[in-house]
């Protein structure tokens, strides 16, 4: 095996040992030292927490108002019935939300095969026991809601404000969407030619039958690869935030006093005092303006009224006045 000292080995030997339709052992080698644990732990976490699937989320049972009760003629209490329903393995095609019905009477076990469903639904474990009827006259009728999701979602996390009006008797069930029942991995030593410091990754996986183990690992690897894609072409795609600069002064203060359309007498008096901009004017006080030659109380009242109509007044304090644009003029 020849190659660059910086070149990473890629696993090329994959052995799949099918223990049963729902149980398989996958062996991957050779891997660079340390990569067995790196990849094994990442795949294990995804398989346990992030695999999509279908699960029972709500149940309505005739004659049952809450989960802390029992039903006449049924051997198990309602909590145990709900626990058994959580073990239902369901595959749903083309839908994210379906309702199933179960109607059974007479002595004997009630199993998943007794559930009525349409062609888009497949119950993988039809022999799964839901409860037992103990009397010839006993019966059980229920409506089961199955939804698509990911990982594990407790019933408490699916209670929203609008669910306060949920009908009495509709029982929420903790949803275990993941089709993976058990996952474990082990890292063993591997050898390629003269190299003895390599890893062999052994993954042992069991599912509920809704997905075969090989497909589960394939999907988990796809999820991991898609998440890592962002690092392959790493760059900051955020647009630089453009800070909107606020003007130092209200634009109206930068306008000439002529824009106030004062009488000729008042305008001339202001110009004589070198008051050219509205910003110059609002900084003056009434006392200062009354000292202006030929500007009397009538003109002062006119100026105050015009400023007030624009939300301004005399005696205002303006920091850093005049601005550079005016000072240069």
Swiss-Prot record:
Keyword check for Transferase: yes
GO cellular component annotations of the record: cytoplasm; DNA-directed RNA polymerase complex
UniProt keyword annotations, A-Z: DNA-directed RNA polymerase, Nucleotidyltransferase, Transcription, Transferase
EC code(s) of this entry: 2.7.7.6
GO biological process, one term: DNA-templated transcription
Top enzyme class: transferase
Pfam family, one: RNA_pol_L
Catalytic activity: RNA(n) + a ribonucleoside 5'-triphosphate = RNA(n+1) + diphosphate
Top-level taxon of origin: Bacteria
GO MF term list: DNA binding; DNA-directed RNA polymerase activity; protein dimerization activity
Similarity comment text for this entry: Belongs to the RNA polymerase alpha chain family.
HAMAP family, alphabetized: RNApol_bact_RpoA
Protein's job: DNA-dependent RNA polymerase catalyzes the transcription of DNA into RNA using the four ribonucleoside triphosphates as substrates.
Domain topic, free-text comment: The N-terminal domain is essential for RNAP assembly and basal transcription, whereas the C-terminal domain is involved in interaction with transcriptional regulators and with upstream promoter elements.
Oligomer status and interactors: Homodimer. The RNAP catalytic core consists of 2 alpha, 1 beta, 1 beta' and 1 omega subunit. When a sigma factor is associated with the core the holoenzyme is formed, which can initiate transcription.
Protein name in the entry: DNA-directed RNA polymerase subunit alpha
Gene name of this polypeptide: rpoA
């Amino acid at each position: 095996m020849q190659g660059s000292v910086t070149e990473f080995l890629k696993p090329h030997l994959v052995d799949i040992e099918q223990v049963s339709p729902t149980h398989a052992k996958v062996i991957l080698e050779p891997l660079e030292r340390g990569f067995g644990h790196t990849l094994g732990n990442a795949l294990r976490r995804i398989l346990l927490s992030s695999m999509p699937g279908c699960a029972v989320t709500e149940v309505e049972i005739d004659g049952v108002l809450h989960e802390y009760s029992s039903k006449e003629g049924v051997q198990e209490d309602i909590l145990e019935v709900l626990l058994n329903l959580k073990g239902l393995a369901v595959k749903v095609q083309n839908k994210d939300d379906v309702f199933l019905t179960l109607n059974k009477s007479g002595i004997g076990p009630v199993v998943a095969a007794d559930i009525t469903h349409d062609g888009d639904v497949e119950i993988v474990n039809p022999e799964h026991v839901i409860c037992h009827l103990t009397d010839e006259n006993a019966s059980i009728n229920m409506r089961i809601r199955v939804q698509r999701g990911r990982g594990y979602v407790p019933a408490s996390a699916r209670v929203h404000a609008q669910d306060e009006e949920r009908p009495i008797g509709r029982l929420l069930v903790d949803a275990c969407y993941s089709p993976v029942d058990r996952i474990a991995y082990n890292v063993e030593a591997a050898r390629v030619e003269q190299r003895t410091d390599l890893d062999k990754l052994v993954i042992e996986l069991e599912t509920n039958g809704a997905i075969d183990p090989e497909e589960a690992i394939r999907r988990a690897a796809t999820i991991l690869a898609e998440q890592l894609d962002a690092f392959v072409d790493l760059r900051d795609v955020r647009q630089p935030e453009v800070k909107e600069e606020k003007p130092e002064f209200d634009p109206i203060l930068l306008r000439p006093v002529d824009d106030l359309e004062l009488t000729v007498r008042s305008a001339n008096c202001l110009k004589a005092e070198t008051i050219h901009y509205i910003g110059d004017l609002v900084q003056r006080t009434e006392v200062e303006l009354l000292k202006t030659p030929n500007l009397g109380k009538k003109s002062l009242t006119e100026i105050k009224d015009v400023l007030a109509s624009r939300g301004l007044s005399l005696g205002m304090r303006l920091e850093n006045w005049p601005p550079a644009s005016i000072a240069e003029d």
